[in-house]
């Protein structure tokens, strides 16, 4: 029989907080991630690579060979250049370590990061010193909770790259998005031309010499340049429709993301600045919001004495004039799609 006290409470009952603290003591301390190739890899990486591979196969293996003979060379050169450029900048954006200079010079990525103790420190970074990385960080650096390190010129944590985007790889990220949008737009133009020509003048899609041996107009050749595969019209149309729908969905997301970053560039803001400024405005009264001056990049009320991308402790009464973030301990600024939002790093 359970032993109870006078209030009817089990004496062996443990407070949830104490239970949680006991569990945390036995959990291994996390390591910092070097770049987008560091485990754990993210499922969004697989989606992006599968999409890139699928678009490459259908574009160069199926649809460009349908174009008029004189257009094929131009299409292969232009689309090939865009796809190769995207691959290069995408790989660079993933591979670069965006950590702050002092972190890269001092940090041993094989060693676990110390746990943050709020009883000793109010914030992760104070007076430009990071208590987790144990280095003096640059002014615009933030400590990313997903990568568990200070990132120079922190913009956001990108799940598609599985890497933080900061000062060292921001422009590679930007050109990766821009080249992907241009490439997808090119695929959409080619697909629209093929669909229109199929109903208007299908002979324009059968200019390759190999079609002279094909008697049936309901038979089409895929992968003409490598290994011609004869298929019926419904198969070609099904592939074209699926590719077009995928291209449209990708272009909407990429276009939105590209426009958003063009806006940030014109305003000289980072994604992190934008999110914090938006959150700050939501917590203001209408009268106070009208009086809020236009702020420059990195000059936000929340960052007046602290640079962070880590959850802050609740403000003490009378010591904090501005609202602070209520991010959970495993949250970071991430891109799932555009616009950006606060999301859990383990999602």
Curated annotation (Swiss-Prot):
Claim: Transmembrane is one of the keywords in the record:
yes
Q: What does this protein do?
A: Endoplasmic reticulum-localized palmitoyltransferase that could catalyze the addition of palmitate onto various protein substrates and be involved in a variety of cellular processes. Has a palmitoyltransferase activity toward NCDN and regulates NCDN association with endosome membranes through this palmitoylation. May play a role in cell proliferation. Also has a palmitoyltransferase activity-independent function in DNA virus-triggered and CGAS-mediated innate immune response. Functions as an adapter that recruits IRF3 to STING1 to promote the activation of that key transcriptional regulator of type I interferon (IFN)-dependent immune response.
Stated name of the protein = Palmitoyltransferase ZDHHC11
Catalytic activity reported: L-cysteinyl-[protein] + hexadecanoyl-CoA = S-hexadecanoyl-L-cysteinyl-[protein] + CoA
Q: What happens when the gene is disrupted?
A: Homozygous knockout mice are viable and do not show overt phenotype. Composition and number of major immune cells is normal but mice are more susceptible to DNA-virus infection and death than their wild-type counterpart.
Keyword Transmembrane part of the UniProt annotation? yes
Q: What is its main location?
A: membrane
Where are the membrane-spanning stretches?
47-67, 76-96, 171-191, 235-255
Organism listed in the record? Mus musculus (Mouse)
């Amino acid at each position: 029989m359970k032993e109870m006290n006078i209030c009817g409470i089990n004496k062996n009952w443990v407070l949830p907080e104490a239970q949680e603290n006991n569990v945390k003591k036995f959990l291994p301390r996390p390591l910092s991630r070097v770049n987008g190739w560091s485990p754990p890899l993210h499922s969004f990486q697989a989606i992006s690579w599968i999409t890139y591979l699928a678009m490459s196969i259908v574009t160069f293996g199926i649809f460009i060979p349908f174009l008029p003979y004189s257009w094929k060379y131009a299409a292969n050169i232009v689309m090939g250049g865009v796809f190769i450029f995207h691959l290069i900048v995408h790989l660079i954006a993933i591979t670069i370590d965006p950590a702050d200079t002092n972190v890269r010079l001092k940090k041993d990525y094989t060693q676990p990061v110390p746990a943050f103790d709020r009883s000793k420190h109010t914030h992760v970074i104070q007076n430009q010193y990071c208590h987790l990385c144990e280095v003096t960080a640059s002014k615009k650096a933030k400590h990313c909770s997903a990568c568990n390190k200070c990132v120079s010129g922190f913009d956001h944590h990108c799940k598609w790259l599985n890497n933080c985007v900061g000062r060292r790889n921001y422009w590679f990220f930007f050109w990766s998005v821009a080249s992907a949008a241009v490439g997808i737009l090119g695929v959409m133009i080619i697909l629209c031309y093929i669909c229109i020509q199929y109903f208007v003048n299908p002979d324009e899609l059968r200019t390759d010499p190999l079609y002279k041996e094909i008697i049936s107009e309901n038979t089409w050749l895929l992968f003409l340049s490598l290994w011609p595969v004869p298929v019926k019209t419904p198969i070609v149309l099904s592939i074209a429709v699926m590719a077009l729908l995928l291209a449209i969905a990708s272009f909407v997301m990429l276009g939105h993301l590209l426009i958003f970053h063009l806006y940030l560039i014109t305003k000289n803001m980072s994604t992190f600045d934008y999110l914090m400024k938006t959150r700050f405005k939501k917590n203001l009264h209408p009268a106070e919001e009208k009086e809020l001056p236009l702020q420059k990049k990195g000059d936000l009320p929340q960052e007046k004495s602290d640079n962070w991308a880590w959850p802050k402790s609740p403000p003490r009464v009378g010591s904090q004039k501005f609202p602070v973030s209520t991010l959970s301990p495993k949250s970071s600024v991430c891109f799932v799609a555009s616009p950006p939002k606060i999301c859990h790093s383990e999602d």
